């Protein structure tokens, strides 16, 4: 077994004494650092590699801290002006994950880089901490690598803001199978198809 396999097995048992101690120490360290900061290397190299990270030029790791909990509706003094069913302010649940929020914030900070993926590293009662893998589309090592140079294409600018990363797709309800026929090809396209009168010649 290689070293990464051992790391992977360690991470699977998060309640073990070793990992609990490690997470507690790291959590204290992360609380002292800035909300978004660059990491010299991934703290979970096995997970980072599974998500596409390579330890070579052009790949960057950023850490982000996101406050836990729901999203309060931003209305002045709780005045929502509408039907009683839409008057909720406090106990609303955000439809996207905190991980996608972390990706978006890092992507906004590093606008010249492309967000590839992200993963959980720690959490406490107030915050969740994530590491985001970014790729430099201007770097020659990226542009010449056929496995990653798809991300150089301009259509992949700010993937994280458009729900195109792994965690972003999850909140869009996209999947395969009979349960996803309302969202297959995108929910707006499905709505349009269902609401467009189509009169075939032979029907």
UniProtKB/Swiss-Prot annotation:
Per its record, what are the GO molecular function terms? RNA binding; structural constituent of ribosome
Q: Which Gene3D superfamilies does this one have?
A: Ribosomal protein l15e
GO CC terms of this entry:
cytosolic large ribosomal subunit
Subcellular localization is given as:
Cytoplasm
**GO biological process per UniProt:** cytoplasmic translation
- Lineage start: Eukaryota, Fungi, Dikarya, Ascomycota, Pezizomycotina
Regarding protein family, the annotation reads: Belongs to the eukaryotic ribosomal protein eL15 family.
Q: What does this protein do?
A: Component of the ribosome, a large ribonucleoprotein complex responsible for the synthesis of proteins in the cell. The small ribosomal subunit (SSU) binds messenger RNAs (mRNAs) and translates the encoded message by selecting cognate aminoacyl-transfer RNA (tRNA) molecules. The large subunit (LSU) contains the ribosomal catalytic site termed the peptidyl transferase center (PTC), which catalyzes the formation of peptide bonds, thereby polymerizing the amino acids delivered by tRNAs into a polypeptide chain.
Share what the entry says about its subunit structure, partners included. Answer: Component of the large ribosomal subunit (LSU). Mature N.crassa ribosomes consist of a small (40S) and a large (60S) subunit. The 40S small subunit contains 1 molecule of ribosomal RNA (18S rRNA) and at least 32 different proteins. The large 60S subunit contains 3 rRNA molecules (26S, 5.8S and 5S rRNA) and at least 42 different proteins.
| Annotated Basic residues bias | 169-186
- Name of one Pfam family that matches: Ribosomal_L15e
List the residue ranges of the region (Disordered).
160-186
What's the name of the protein?
A: Large ribosomal subunit protein eL15
The alphabetical list of record keywords is:
Cytoplasm, Ribonucleoprotein, Ribosomal protein
């Amino acid at each position: 077994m290689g070293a990464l396999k051992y790391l992977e097995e360690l991470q699977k048992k998060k309640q073990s004494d070793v990992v609990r101690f490690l997470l507690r120490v790291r959590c204290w360290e992360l609380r002292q650092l800035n909300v978004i900061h660059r990491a010299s290397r991934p703290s979970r190299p096995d997970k980072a590699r599974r998500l596409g990270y390579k330890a070579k030029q052009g790949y960057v790791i950023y850490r982000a801290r996101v406050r836990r909990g729901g999203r309060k509706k931003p209305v002045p003094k709780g005045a929502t002006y509408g039907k009683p069913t839409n008057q909720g302010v406090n106990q609303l649940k955000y439809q996207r994950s905190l991980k996608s929020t972390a990706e978006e914030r890092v992507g906004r900070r590093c606008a010249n880089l492309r967000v590839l993926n992200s993963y959980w590293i720690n959490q406490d009662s107030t915050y969740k901490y994530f590491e985001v893998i970014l790729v430099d589309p201007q770097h020659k090592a990226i542009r010449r690598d056929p496995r990653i140079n798809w991300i150089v294409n301009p259509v992949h600018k700010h993937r994280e803001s458009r729900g195109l990363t792994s965690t972003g797709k999850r909140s869009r309800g996209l999947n395969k199978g009979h349960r996803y026929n309302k969202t297959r090809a995108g929910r707006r396209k499905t709505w349009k198809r269902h609401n467009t009168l189509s009169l075939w010649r032979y029907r």
